[in-house]
Amino acid sequence: MCIRDRPRMISGAHQGRLLSIISKIISPTKILEIGTFTGYSTLCLSEGLTKGGRIHTVDINEELYDFQRKYFKKSPFNDNIIQHLGNALEVIPTMDNNFDLIFLDADKNNYPEYLDVLISKLKIGGVLLSDNVLWDGKVLNPISEKDISTKAIVKYNKLLSQREDMDTVILPIRDGLTTVSYTHLRAHETRLN
């Protein structure tokens, strides 16, 4: 796969800066990224890590592993980046960390399946960011029966909007970035009583 043939798969400069700012605000100890691609967003997210923090990045494309590693090694975050190669839906359940920040930018067809798996790894008060949730505006128009990706993103957006344990907003940046704060409503109610 040629990288220049996949422009929508890479976070642009503005989105990269936003990811960095969000990460710096949160000051996470543990970040999980689903969908590494070139590693650009990995490096942007790493800018906010606390000292000794770690970012786990998962990608299924083994052809890009060495490409990513080359740039990670040149960065000041090399020791903080842990690469995982494989199907994210199989890799994530093997992780036992409660993540402060999760960034989802992977296979759109599986966005709905990722939701519960990712929430189980997100600590209360953690933030879930999801890329491409406007999907070039297709989520706002009638959807072709054959358009599986758009259907999946619409379903994902609906699932997020129906959850009472999350505060959700879609930012109209590039192709849409959902920002979710996992409040775990029941935990807050228990603390108030």
Residue ranges, per PLM feature:
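S-adenosylmethionine/decaboxylated-SAM
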Residues: 13-182, 186
